[in-house]
Amino acid sequence: MISLITATYGRTEEVRTLLGSLARQSYKDFEFILVDQNPHFILREMVAEYASRLTIQYIRSEAKGLSLNRNIGLDYSRGEIVAFPDDDCFYEEDVLEKVIDVFQRQKDIVLVATAVKDAFDGRVWKVSERELISRNKTLRYCFSNNIFVRKTEARFDVRLGVGAYWGSGEESDYLWEI
């Protein structure tokens, strides 16, 4: 199973787009964990609309901070593989199927990074399947919305990321911990 963990604040239509892309996935053995930092449970009804099509855990969090809330999602996750789609991204229909195929064929890998296409300007950041991602390449190829990792005890440093003292760097730090 794959656990997809999204921490969100201040976005509604973007989350709807993400949910729609998840409902269209060809691979179905995944759960979506939405950690909602918004006031007044504004996403609860939207999540309910998708509950019959997706395995969703909706978690309301009073605490603010991307890394902190991703860690909350990790605490609830049941998958052997975890990923952290941003609340403003979406996946092509076969992404999860391709990712799980790589993990099943290559039992010793801990990380799969997919290609990323910028929806605004069409730029693509692509990783070759044969290319190994070393520590030095995580900054070049690994973004929060394109990394899938075998679940470990690793957690995000709550001092890093949106809403924290240091506003970025949480993905690289997390991957280096793995």
Annotated model-derived regions:
Residues 163-174:
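Acidic donor-binding loop at a coil-to-helix junction in glycosyltransferase catalytic cores
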Residues 78-79, 143-158:
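Conserved nucleotide-sugar donor-binding
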Residues 1-24:
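N-proximal low-complexity "stem/linker" segments adjacent to membrane-targeting elements
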Residues 19-60:
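Acidic donor-binding segment of Leloir-type glycosyltransferases
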Residues 1-3, 31, 173:
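Cell-envelope/extracellular polymer assembly enzymes that use nucleotide-activated donors
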Residues 94-125:
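Conserved donor NDP-sugar-binding/catalytic core segment of glycosyltransferases
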Residues 82:
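Short aromatic/hydrophobic "clamp" motif used to bind/position activated sugar donors
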Residues 61-77:
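Glycine-rich, basic loop-to-helix element that forms the pyrophosphate-binding segment
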